[in-house]
Amino acid sequence: GLQLPYAEVLWREGDDGGEPLLPRPLVQALQLNGGAAHGADPRDHRTITPQPTLPPQAHGSELPVQRLSASAYEDLRRCPYRFFALRQLGLKEADELEDEVDKRDFGLWLHAVLKIFHEALAADVTLGDGLAARLALMEQAAAEATRAAGLPDAAFLPFAAAWPQVRDGYLQWLAEHEATGARFGWAERWQELPLGSITLVGQIDRLDQLADGSTLVMDYKTESIGTTQGRVKTPTEDTQLAFYAALQPDDTLQAAYVNVGEKGGTKTVLQPDVVDVRDVLITGIRHDMERITSGAAMAAAVRLAETPEM
């Protein structure tokens, strides 16, 4: 191309990440030798009047909320428009068939294992607190949960490799937990509570009775311990435990996340002052439902609007 009497050479001055890009050495050499000159930009410059598009101002007063779960209320707190779209309009993404087992599948499986284990342990008083018997019972529960879930052996291998550490860490935590006088109450039970014109609903992972007679509401987590601790760093910003506490007619209860880790063992992360946080949450729910009924705009939160999900 350089043999022609005239040639136009174009190059990018920056990449997609904003980093500057220099022309190729050949082009730089031509510029230094006077063999190339910057051409004039042939594009016409135009002044365009901005015409911003306002975010949607949805109103949910014609779609009354009758049942409210912890995850639904979390949607409302994070992004009212998301709540309107998913919970009131019922818009959902089409489900995709996946043959890979992910962390969520492992979490569901673990919930099932612990439910089977604790119910069997509570039903057989002869087992006591012997570690060998509990290990055998936990393995039976794992096998039963795997069969019920229909999980393929090959796909489950990564989690199967981590299971012994998870199991042993949990049993050690359980022994320490029971040493305080705590006793298993029930697991995976659906709860409902009328609140004005709506009904609060949810399935609580586990409820124990403590030595002083009070109740401990628990929710299992398989995430990193730092993530779990971050949930309770600002108590009033955590929806889940306070919501589950609202489903229990008890003013002396406690609530905690039980982080079932693969490497660091199982740890309890208490939600401090959960009764006070629960009362604040209930007040907030009443207020928010009244605003929706009165026609308040369901605005989109910018931080979520940047990642469309509808």
What is each PLM-predicted segment?
Residues E8-L10, G14-M310:
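RecB-family 4Fe-4S metal-dependent nuclease core
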Residues G1-Q3, A58-H59:
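Conserved short internal alpha-helix adjacent to the catalytic or cofactor-binding core
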